[in-house]
């Protein structure tokens, strides 16, 4: 049991150390992230968070940037339905790092950004003295989602998540289907 706890602890520490990497802001600024997005894949070191109706099985609807902060409308599974919620991730002194209050405190990082095509972000979530790692792949055009899955897998590996911890979202997902 002690060996298992040590292994889990080391895996989490390695994942958290990856946050110190270089994350460059989009060349044209955060404003380029504004507009419609489609959630296509999630990953987490805690599968319950991204399973259907999990706390981080959320679907980005749209984003906008103002004063260096990111504002997002997301669809959240809630009581058997999907609720549209607006959240704001506040800029920090660190480039491409934001503070987000959602199911605890989150350090949100923009890992890879091509504002016209795809966005990969990850969050380090603190909730009730428990730390979790969650990654999210979004695309502008759903027909190109397969083009960006290898980049998502690579980012996940870099932050300590494994391929078997990735969930590719289907078109049948209820929140994805309830988009405007």
From Swiss-Prot:
The keyword Signal applies. One of its GO terms (cellular component) is extracellular space. Disulfide bonds join 82-175. The keyword Transport applies. SUPFAM superfamilies: Lipocalins. Tongue epithelial tissue and parotid gland. Glycans are attached at residue 45. It is found in: Secreted. Its main location: secreted. PANTHER family: LIPOCALIN (PTHR11430), MAJOR URINARY PROTEIN 1-RELATED (PTHR11430:SF76). This is Minor allergen Can f 2. It comes from Canis lupus familiaris (Dog).
């Amino acid at each position: 049991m002690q060996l298992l706890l040590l292994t889990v602890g080391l895996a989490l520490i390695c994942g958290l150390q990856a946050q110190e990497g270089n994350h460059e802001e989009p060349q044209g600024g955060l404003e380029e992230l504004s507009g419609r997005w489609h959630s296509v894949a999630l990953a987490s070191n805690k599968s319950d968070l991204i399973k259907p109706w999990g706390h981080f099985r959320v679907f980005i609807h749209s984003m906008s940037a103002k004063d260096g902060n990111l504002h997002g409308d997301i669809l959240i599974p809630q009581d058997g339905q999907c609720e549209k919620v607006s959240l704001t991730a506040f800029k920090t002194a660190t480039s491409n790092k934001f503070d987000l209050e959602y199911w605890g405190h989150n350090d949100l990082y923009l890992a890879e950004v091509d504002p016209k095509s795809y966005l990969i972000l990850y969050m380090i979530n603190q909730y009730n003295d428990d730390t979790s790692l969650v990654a999210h792949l979004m695309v502008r055009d759903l027909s190109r989602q397969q083009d960006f899955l290898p980049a998502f897998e690579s980012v996940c590996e870099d932050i300590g998540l494994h391929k078997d911890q990735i969930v590719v979202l289907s078109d049948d997902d209820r929140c994805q289907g309830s988009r405007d």
